[in-house]
């Protein structure tokens, strides 16, 4: 009677798809080489036949070799290709042939390595394509099976074991497995050994059962060392753990085991034990016993003796068709989790080809404080989220007005009703609506400004302390306010705390984007200056306040494209700073001559920086569509970042700030700017102008 085999059916746990996605994004990238994957199967006596023979792939199958109790391992490979066209165009038959031969089943049987890894007899291959944008996974399992020529036929089917025999066999097999590698657990030899006068049974090892024989279990390799010598054929069993529950049809891996029996054992008749029992129900016999025969006929042989036989094994669907399966993971995923993975996807794709050394975590884990939630603040926050930043905090004391939504992308019309929502609160809410995974909060407060008298000392001190704590709790501080004097205190605090301070300011068709110099870890002076280092006067209410300005001076009157351009360059500058080994202390790029063109160009520092240059300042001129990279050293008389100012702030804290806000010339005198001004005036007075004033009264003026 011809023998039919129960094929495997694949069963993938959902976490496996996530693990495969992460492996593709973070590690494999464009590499589509086959990777090992662990498969598991088990005898399921209670399963209906059509639900049996399941090859399970767990969530940790790509990273773990752990085999759960009661399961048998199978050696798998997965080839995750880069495009759906690669999947469609793959030569499926060649892939199946390769998975059955090269270093796998056929080669292992011929060279004997199958004895070390019998689990290869139940091996499988997965061809897959993961659409990481739509979370769909196209895959196709193959369970390579070598055909025997001529085919094995069932000549006899002995009765099942008794409950007592099954119990003894199960216990003996369990003992044997403890001392053997789990790759051997699915295939073994079993024999009945009856005591004789020459070989009496050892009383100490005698079983408590009343069976007249003892079960002995051996590895597949022991056949060649005489495991069955002296044992009657009816007591010899070449065995495998069978996941099939069909009454007459054994599991798929028996095909490969029978090829081993023919080529290694040189048998044309064999008794097969399809082991289907388990320890929990060992008193209920389930195993199937088959006596198979394959008469060798040289004329029937269709392949050369050393040529790999016919291979089949691609999985069929529930309708019996040879076709791939598609799983849509999006329907199983929490929307927030989908958003979380999607946000990171485009960033991680940068590392596949363009910037493999890009450190995305350095950007993602940077906590950003945005002082100002207006035009600059709203654009900057969106771009920070685009880079994957998860912590964004707003500080602003203004409300959304009707003129804001068209220029500030986090607000809309309803935010202007009833006096307008507070910008800081609404901006943080809007970020969370856009991406729930962001940690965003808003604080409504006025930043104490140099030159603005204190009207409520308690409230001003409270704002000072809150700002101080916020700066300490964040890594990068963005100065995005409307006025110059409002940037002074955060500049001092950021410098004292050693934070990265990013600054942007707008004109009608111009902008400046810059990073403030950070004091090196060795305590030396900062090489680069801050926003105030080019000033010869301290910021003050008399010069910079909006009180006495006309409407066009009070509003941010700029071309609409200036703010998004400045914001994008500011965020990209931060990303470049975070990729530099020195972070905020990175030097400005230096000019050198290009040997080929002869032109001056900025050097990338370091040469392998994944994002290019790390400039100090970028000045943009929209009217001419130009940008300039410039740098300026720190100024030892700067009103904000000079050592005298920073040290006074560190020593006296609020008292220093209180004095700076109330005494008009305190900062100018302390920083040394006042002395610079006096010396400049003295020098101007000392200049001798070369002019001849004598006789001028008598001369006629020249007529124009």
From Swiss-Prot:
It comes from the Eukaryota. GO terms for molecular function: Atg12 activating enzyme activity; Atg8 activating enzyme activity. Homodimer. Interacts with ATG8 through a thioester bond between Cys-555 and the C-terminal Gly of ATG8 and with ATG12 through a thioester bond between Cys-555 and the C-terminal Gly of ATG12. Also interacts with ATG3. A motif (GXGXXG motif) lies at residues 372-377. Residues 660-699 are annotated as: Homodimerization. Disruption phenotype: Blocks the autophagic process. Leads to fewer aerial hyphae and slower mycelial growth rate and fails to produce any conidia. Also reduces the production of sclerotia in cold environment. Fails to infect wounded cucumber leaves and shows only slight virulence on wounded tomato and grape fruits. One of its GO terms (biological process) is piecemeal microautophagy of the nucleus. Signal peptide: none annotated. Pfam families: ATG7_N (PF16420), ThiF (PF00899). Residues 682-704 are annotated as: Disordered. E1-like activating enzyme involved in the 2 ubiquitin-like systems required for cytoplasm to vacuole transport (Cvt) and autophagy. Activates ATG12 for its conjugation with ATG5 and ATG8 for its conjugation with phosphatidylethanolamine. Both systems are needed for the ATG8 association to Cvt vesicles and autophagosomes membranes. Autophagy is essential for maintenance of amino acid levels and protein synthesis under nitrogen starvation. This is Ubiquitin-like modifier-activating enzyme atg7. The active site is at residue 555. CDD domains: Apg7. Residues 687-704 have a biased composition (Acidic residues). InterPro entries: Atg7 (IPR006285), Atg7_N (IPR032197), Atg7_N_1 (IPR042522), Atg7_N_2 (IPR042523), ThiF/MoeB/HesA (IPR045886), ThiF_NAD_FAD-bd (IPR000594), Ubiquitin-activating_enz (IPR035985).
């Amino acid at each position: 009677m011809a023998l039919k085999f129960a094929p495997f059916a694949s069963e993938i746990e959902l976490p496996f798809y996530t693990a495969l996605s992460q492996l593709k994004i973070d590690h494999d990238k464009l590499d589509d080489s086959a990777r090992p994957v662990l498969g598991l199967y088990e005898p399921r006596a209670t399963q209906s036949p059509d639900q049996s023979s399941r090859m399970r792939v767990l969530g940790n199958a790509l990273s773990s070799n752990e085999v759960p109790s009661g399961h048998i391992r199978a050696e798998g490979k997965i080839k995750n290709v880069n495009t759906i066209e690669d999947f469609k165009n793959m030569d499926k038959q060649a892939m199946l042939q390769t998975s059955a031969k090269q270093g796998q089943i056929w080669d292992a049987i011929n060279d004997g390595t199958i004895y070390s890894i019998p689990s290869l007899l139940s091996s499988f291959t997965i061809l897959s394509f993961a659409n990481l944008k739509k979370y769909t996974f196209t895959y196709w399992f193959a369970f390579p099976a070598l055909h025997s020529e001529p085919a094995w036929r069932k000549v006899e089917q002995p009765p099942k074991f008794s409950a007592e025999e099954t119990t003894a066999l199960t216990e003996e097999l369990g003992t044997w497995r403890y001392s053997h590698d789990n790759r051997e657990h699915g295939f073994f030899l079993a024999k009945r050994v009856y005591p004789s006068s020459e070989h009496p049974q050892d009383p100490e090892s005698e079983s408590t059962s009343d069976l007249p024989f003892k079960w002995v279990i051996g590895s597949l390799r022991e056949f060649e060392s005489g495991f069955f010598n002296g044992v009657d054929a009816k007591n010899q069993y070449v065995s495998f753990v069978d996941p099939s529950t069909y009454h007459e049809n054994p599991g798929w891996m028996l095909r490969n085991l029978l090829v081993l029996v023919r080529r290694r054992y040189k048998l044309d008749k064999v008794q097969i034990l399809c082991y289907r029992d388990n320890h929990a129900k060992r008193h209920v016999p389930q195993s199937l016993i088959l006596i198979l025969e394959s008469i060798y006929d040289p004329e029937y042989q269709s392949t050369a003796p050393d040529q790999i036989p016919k291979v089949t094994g691609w999985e069929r669907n529930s309708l019996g068709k040879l076709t791939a399966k598609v799983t849509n993971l999006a329907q199983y995923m929490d929307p927030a989790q989908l958003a979380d993975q999607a946000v990171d996807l485009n960033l991680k794709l940068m590392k596949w080809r363009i910037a493999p050394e890009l450190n995305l975590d350095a950007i993602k884990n940077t906590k950003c404080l945005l002082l100002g939630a207006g035009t600059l603040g709203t654009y900057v926050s969106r771009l920070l989220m685009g880079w994957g930043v998860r912590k964004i905090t707003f500080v602003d004391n203004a409300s959304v007005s009707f003129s804001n939504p068209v220029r500030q992308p986090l607000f809309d019309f309803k935010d202007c009703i009833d006096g307008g929502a507070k910008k800081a609160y609404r901006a943080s809410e809007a970020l969370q609506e856009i991406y729930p995974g962001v940690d965003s909060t808003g604080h409504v407060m006025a930043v104490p400004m140099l030159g603005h008298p204190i009207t409520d000392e308690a409230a001003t001190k409270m704002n000072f302390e809150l700002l101080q704590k916020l700066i300490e709790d964040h890594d990068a501080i963005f100065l995005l306010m409307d006025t110059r004097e409002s940037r002074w205190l955060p500049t001092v605090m950021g410098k004292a705390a050693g934070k990265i301070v990013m600054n942007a300011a707008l004109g009608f068709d111009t902008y400046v984007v810059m990073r403030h110099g950070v004091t090196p870890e060795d305590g030396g002076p900062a090489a680069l200056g801050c926003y105030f280092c080019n000033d010869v006067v301290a910021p003050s209410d008399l010069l910079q306040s909006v009180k006495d300005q006309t409407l066009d001076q009070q509003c941010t009157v700029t071309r609409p494209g200036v703010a998004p351009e400045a914001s994008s360059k500011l965020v990209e500058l931060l990303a470049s700073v975070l990729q530099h080994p020195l972070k905020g202390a990175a030097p400005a790029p230096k000019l050198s001559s290009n040997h080929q063109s002869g032109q001056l160009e900025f050097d990338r520092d370091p040469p392998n920086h994944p994002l290019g240059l790390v400039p100090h300042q970028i000045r943009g001129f929209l009217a001419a569509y130009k940008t300039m990279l410039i740098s300026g050293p720190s100024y030892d008389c700067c009103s904000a970042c000079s050592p005298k100012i920073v040290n006074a702030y560190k020593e006296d804290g609020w008292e220093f700030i209180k004095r700076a806000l109330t005494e008009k010339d305190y900062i100018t005198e302390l920083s040394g700017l006042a002395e610079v001004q006096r010396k400049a005036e003295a020098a101007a007075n000392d200049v001798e102008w070369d002019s001849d004033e004598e006789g001028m009264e008598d001369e006629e003026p020249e007529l124009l």
